[in-house]
Design a protein with these regions (language model features):
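Bacterial Sec-dependent N-terminal signal peptides
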Residues: 1-23, 397, 451, 466, ...
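Beta-strand signatures of extracellular beta-sandwich domains
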Residues: 26, 62, 429-433
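Acidic Gly/Asp/Thr-rich repetitive segments characteristic of extracellular carbohydrate-active
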Residues: 30-62, 370-378, 412, 440
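N-terminal extracellular ligand-recognition/capping segment immediately after the signal peptide
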Residues: 58-81, 87-90
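Predominantly extracellular beta-rich ligand-binding scaffolds that present long acidic/polar faces
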Residues: 71-78, 113, 133-134, 140-145, ...
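Right-handed parallel beta-helix/beta-spiral solenoid domain characteristic of secreted/periplasmic
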Residues: 79-124, 350
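Surface beta-loop-beta hairpin patches that serve as ligand-binding interfaces in beta-rich domains
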Residues: 362-396
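C-terminal outer-membrane/trafficking sorting elements
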Residues: 400-480
């Protein structure tokens, strides 16, 4: 009897351990094979059924193709798991009305990561967050390489795609495009909690009142290396504005670094309610570029950062055309853009750089200019550039991403040679500029491995510009 009991216990533990071990579950629009989710060939045809099998830490749900989901329950999963797209076609789409994809209102320690997914056409009339509403201090939510497009909220709570309160939200390499709110936060509304956004794109989002892309009540935002393009607020009420970012609450602390704000608009004709609007809290903007941002429905401007008298605002080493007189601390970089506060002085003029937004890359691009012209990487006359240069801003020369993967630059301090290695099949020419924009070197038809003697150049930072018949790239290097 004792032997039987012992064997029974061991067998039970084995079965339980197997039941709750890490597993991968598959779901598609119509399902396949036996529809038990055990493989792509046997994918579930129902998203909610597939979620039931996500029952232990590190489980993964793979989404195949386009799956339509009304509302899904994940709040009861008190562990870390991932919902991931199989490929670029993996999409979760909604059917609108009185539904929201995910709601995390209950007390939970959920840690969920969404990866390689598109969330589209969730048009909800619920109170905030068409794709996600989270109001739980124990929640950790991550979106990695996702796309939110054409989601909307028509209830007054705001957050066309996401409404987040408490907990921790991390967004990396994600695009928010054409999301809307009939109130605040066209893409994201942060009531509280910690929200970190890195290397992401906010394009053509809109809100009827505040925060065309993002609205912060008392959340703490850290935004780095991201682009805000063509976002808008459409209301003309007394507090409406902040086409890209609006901060309202005294408890909000925000950091914006290495970001680009380009061609965002507000409906109001008040310059103090432009691309960013801060009414309270503590907000710091550094190493960023503001350009072509307008007010009065794109007919007037510029209007980059408007602010009320409350809170603390810091604007440093950044390029802009107009910021409010209520900005407390202004350090543009010696000799660079001093005087734009309140419209005095000379605003940035980057006309010759021909800034454009590349829909494919989600980046603002510019063309190379003469040394006498201001550009995003060479602004001012003191060699202390702001914006792109000091920060590695989210700017690139035309088609730079393509070329940058095919070229390397090394400086050998012993031989005083610059070594350039590339695998570009087209003819390529190189130019070297000082930090002030003076051309000091020019070579045509360089070899796949080219040694360039730069012994005659002084120590300092230089810009290497490469050109093919159709493309440009730029790299910086140091001679020491």
């Amino acid at each position: 009897m004792k032997k039987i009991t012992f064997l029974t216990i061991c067998l039970s533990l084995f079965l339980v351990g197997g039941l709750f071990s890490q597993q991968t579950v598959y779901v598609s629009a119509t399902g396949a094979g036996s529809k038990d989710g055990t493989s792509e060939a046997n994918a579930y045809g129902n998203f909610s059924f597939a979620l039931v099998d996500i029952n232990s830490a590190e489980d993964k749900l793979i989404v195949i193709g386009t799956v339509t989901v009304g509302a899904a329950t994940i709040w009861n999963k008190n562990f870390a798991f991932t919902i991931e797209g199989k490929d670029a076609t993996s999409t979760i789409t909604g059917n609108g009305g009185a539904s929201r994809l995910f709601t995390l209102n209950q007390s939970t320690t959920i840690d969920v990561t969404f990866k390689d997914l598109t969330f589209s056409n969730y048009n909800s009339n619920l109170a905030g967050g068409a794709v996600l509403l989270s109001n739980n201090a124990g929640a950790t939510v991550t979106f990695d390489n996702c796309i939110f497009t054409d989601n909307s909220i028509s209830n007054g709570a705001g957050g066309g795609a996401i409404l987040f309160a408490n907990g921790n939200l991390t967004i990396t390499g994600t695009t928010f495009k054409s999301n809307t709110s009939t109130d605040e936060g066209g893409a994201i509304m942060g009531l509280s909690g910690t929200i970190t956004i890195t290397n992401s794109v906010f394009e053509s989002n809109s809100a009827a009142t505040k925060g065309g892309a993002i609205y912060s009540s008392s959340a703490n935002f850290t935004i780095t290396g991201s682009t805000f393009y063509d976002n808008a607020t459409t209301g003309i009420g007394n507090s409406d504005g902040g086409a890209a970012f609006n901060v309202a609450g005294a408890g909000s602390t925000n950091s914006i670094t290495n970001c680009t704000f380009y061609q965002n608009t507000t409906a109001r004709a008040n310059q103090d309610y432009g691309t960013i609007r801060t009414d309270n809290g503590n907000t710091t903007v550094s190493n960023s570029l503001f350009y072509g941002n307008k007010m009065d429905n794109d007919t007037a401007g510029p209007s980059d950062w408007g602010s009320g008298p409350n809170g603390t605002q810091t604007f440093e080493t950044s390029i802009a055309q107009w910021i409010s007189i209520n900005i407390d601390n202004q350090d543009e970089g010696t000799g660079s853009i001093t005087g734009i506060k309140g419209g005095a002085g000379t605003p940035a003029n980057l006309t010759s750089s021909n800034l454009t937004f590349n829909l494919a890359t989600g980046k603002v691009e510019y063309v190379a200019v003469d040394s006498t012209e201001d550009s995003p990487i060479d602004f001012g006359s003191d060699g202390n550039d702001v914006g792109a240069w000091n920060s590695g801003l989210t700017l690139s020369l035309e088609k730079e991403d393509f070329l940058a993967t095919k070229i390397s630059v090394y400086y050998n301090s012993a031989s005083k040679n610059l070594e350039v290695l590339h695998s570009i099949s087209e003819p390529i020419s190189l130019e070297v500029y000082t930090i002030l924009g003076t051309k000091v070197l020019s070579l045509n038809n360089i070899n796949a491995r080219q040694l360039i003697n730069v012994n005659h150049l002084n120590t300092g930072i230089y810009i290497l510009v490469g050109k093919t018949p159709e493309k440009f790239f730029s790299k910086k290097f140091l001679i020491n």
